[in-house]
């Protein structure tokens, strides 16, 4: 008996579109019973299996389809989708490339390939694919949105904004693209525009927790704490387990000085993507702050060097609660910490820690110690130098002993999420260099240290970057300076911990640890804070620094 396979396949396609997978399967099986190598039937069965999350069967069906017809582009595409959904990115990529080799002008294929490359952190490849997608389909808003995200992640803010604006022009009522654009405006300091984007998104979907949290975040950046807390808590009321909202609420409470709630809420950081990558899956229990005189406690620094320097101050308060303390800190400050902090052993990541019974991340100590020790321990200096630390470093530097010696740092870690705001250009410091009686010494390290070479032609800056091989070296130099002027970096924390007079230069949207509107720091008594009065305005800040420096010199 002959059957009309085309009719059966048409019925199968209609059933798939209507979600009637059981009927569609029967039609496909009927075709295969008559013609077991029918490519379309195997392809349809693959799509049905994918809808039902039967990934193994879907892979088998799509593989059969491409084996029967290697030029079946859609089968290659869907095979890639299955691999993508099962986190087999290399296989997904191979399948997409097979599809593209047969249909090189298909924007959907380029977009899917870009997504796979983005997941594999191949940023350049992903950008190229998304650009090809919009080349062949100029109104492909998802591609513009992803391009905006990638440009943002690579610090190309102008391009990020351009792509986000394009996406919004194509999808003006889409909450996702409005949130993307609003987030970029927020990072660039355009808070009113950011708020307008988020409020428009809320008018479209009033209970969207992403939008509510973003709105709270931009109000936090703009220092409107009441509104920041209102929108953040509204998101939590709608979705009590929404991680970003809890994380932002922790920052709101901490910047407000509400340590009681803030340190508790700060534990939500371990649920965020950034912190999950540094989480430790120890079998030993987490220390809760209780007295355990027979136990050995491992305290491990989970964040950056500056955070480690700032929070090792709390270790002293643990001393009388446990038997032994092992402290793990970044290798770059191991020597300083070993000499300064009273623990039984200091190690660096990767070193054998010896046996321990309990553990705790360093920035969880304030929570564990609360409320018995609820204040900020601010006895400084709490770091000191080993007696052999100098090793001729000071004598090798050309010091102008008759002048006031100022160390400067203008840039932090370029990988920091807020680096585009908290770092500045060296050119802003040049206005200080005309003040008579001052010698300037660059303590800058990293890729931005080379900026001093051009500036030194016209300004007398002593470049110490090649001499500073460790934080111990930097600390040695600091002890011979009259003042350190720095943006928010580990160097500023080091200077504060050494009780060196320090002027900290902060962006308008500064980190929670510097609190709100203060010109002093409860962490470091020797520190004075200069703040931007509006986003991105380094000029006014440096005018204040210049005036204060002139006053300091005249009184010295």
What do the predicted segments below correspond to?
Residues 1-483, 488-556:
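Alpha-helical solenoid repeat scaffolds of the TPR/TPR-like class and their adjacent stem/linker regions
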């Amino acid at each position: 008996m002959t059957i009309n396979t085309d009719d059966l396949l048409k019925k199968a396609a209609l059933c798939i579109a209507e979600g009637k997978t059981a009927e569609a399967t029967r039609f496909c099986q009927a075709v295969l019973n008559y013609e077991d190598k029918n490519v379309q039937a195997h392809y349809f069965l693959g799509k049905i299996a994918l809808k039902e999350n039967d990934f193994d069967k879907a892979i088998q069906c799509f593989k059969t389809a491409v084996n029967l017809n290697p030029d079946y582009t859609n089968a290659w595409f869907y095979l890639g989708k299955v691999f993508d959904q099962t986190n087999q990115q290399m296989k997904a990529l191979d399948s997409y490339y097979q599809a593209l080799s047969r249909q090189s002008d298909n924007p959907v294929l380029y977009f899917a390939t870009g997504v796979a490359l983005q997941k594999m952190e191949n940023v350049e490849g992903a950008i190229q694919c998304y650009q090809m997608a919009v080349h062949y389909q100029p109104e492909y808003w998802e591609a513009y949105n992803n391009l905006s995200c990638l440009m943002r992640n690579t610090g190309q803010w102008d391009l990020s904004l351009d792509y986000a604006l394009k996406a919004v022009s194509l999808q003006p009522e889409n909450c996702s693209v409005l949130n993307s654009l609003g987030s970029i405006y927020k990072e660039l300091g355009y808070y009113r525009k950011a708020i307008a984007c988020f409020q428009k998104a809320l008018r479209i979907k009033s209970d969207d927790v992403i939008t509510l949290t973003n709105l709270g975040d931009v109000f936090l950046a703009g220092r409107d704490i009441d509104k920041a807390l209102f929108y953040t808590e509204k998101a939590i009321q709608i979705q009590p387990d929404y991680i970003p909202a809890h994380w932002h609420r922790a920052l709101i409470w901490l910047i407000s000085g509400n340590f009681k709630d803030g340190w508790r809420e700060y534990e939500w950081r371990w649920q965020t993507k950034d912190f999950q990558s540094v989480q430790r899956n120890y079998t030993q229990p987490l220390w809760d702050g209780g007295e355990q005189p027979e136990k050995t406690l491992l305290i491990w620094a989970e964040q950056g060097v500056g955070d480690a320097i700032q929070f090792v101050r709390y270790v002293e308060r643990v001393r009388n609660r446990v038997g032994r303390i092992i402290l793990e800190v970044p290798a770059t400050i191991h020597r300083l910490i070993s000499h300064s902090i009273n623990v039984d052993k200091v190690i660096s990541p990767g070193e054998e820690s010896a046996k321990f019974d309990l553990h705790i991340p360093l920035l969880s100590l304030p929570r564990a110690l609360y409320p018995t020790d609820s204040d900020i321990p601010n006895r400084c200096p709490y770091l000191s130098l080993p007696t052999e630390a100098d090793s001729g470093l000071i004598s090798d530097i050309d010091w102008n002993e008759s002048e006031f010696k100022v160390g400067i740092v203008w840039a932090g870690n370029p990988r920091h999420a807020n680096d585009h705001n908290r770092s500045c250009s060296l050119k802003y410091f040049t206005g200080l260099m005309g003040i008579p009686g001052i010698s300037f010494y660059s303590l800058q390290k990293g890729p931005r240290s080379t900026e001093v070479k051009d500036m030194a032609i016209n300004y007398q800056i002593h470049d110490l970057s090649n001499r500073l091989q460790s934080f111990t070296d930097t600390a040695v130099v600091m002890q011979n300076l009259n003042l350190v002027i720095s943006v928010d970096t580990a160097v500023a924390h080091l200077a504060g911990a050494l009780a060196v007079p320090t002027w900290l230069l902060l962006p308008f949207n500064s980190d929670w640890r510097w609190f709100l509107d203060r010109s002093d720091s409860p962490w470091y008594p020797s520190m004075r804070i200069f703040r931007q009065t509006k986003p991105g305005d380094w000029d006014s800040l440096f005018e204040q620094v210049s005036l204060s420096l002139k006053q300091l010199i005249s009184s010295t």
